[in-house]
UniProtKB/Swiss-Prot annotation:
InterPro entries: Phage_A118_VSP1. The keyword NAD does not apply. Belongs to the Lactobacillus delbrueckii bacteriophages ORF1 protein family. Signal peptide: none annotated. GO terms for molecular function: structural molecule activity. One of its GO terms (cellular component) is virion component. It is found in: Virion. Its main location: virion. This is Structural protein.
Length: 123
């Protein structure tokens, strides 16, 4: 193609046409035409450090959600064997982690409470 500029890598250099490459499986990239000297990048720019901090906070939320599920499973097992002391301990742990989730969500506007992540399958 005579319009190709060797100054820029082609889309094929980034795995276009392969599942792991650009526009492959689960790829959310979008293609836009680019004309040198004319095109202006209007995409939203993100602060890298803020994104890392937000990711760490979100990881903490996911940890709390995993703990809620773990303690709910233990509580279910305690109910099935009739251990009321363990049930009370599990209920307390569940409330403690749910409280931590409420706190972290209220302190960070980019987070939302996702109750389905706290549910367990009743087997």
């Amino acid at each position: 193609d005579p319009r190709f500029n060797p100054k820029y890598p082609t889309i094929y250099d980034y795995g276009y046409g392969t599942p792991a490459g650009t526009l492959g499986i689960n790829c959310m990239h979008e293609l836009y035409p680019y004309v040198e000297g004319v095109t202006i990048n209007r995409q939203k720019h993100y602060d890298e450090q803020e994104a890392i901090r937000n990711g760490e906070i979100q990881q903490m939320q996911r940890y709390y959600e995993r703990q809620v599920r773990k303690w709910k499973q233990r509580k279910l097992a305690a109910e099935r064997i009739g251990n009321t002391n363990l049930e009370a301990k599990c209920s307390s742990a569940i409330r403690r982690y749910q409280s931590k989730i409420r706190k972290i969500v209220s302190e960070n506007d980019f987070l939302t409470r996702q109750y389905d992540r706290e549910k367990i399958a009743n087997i």
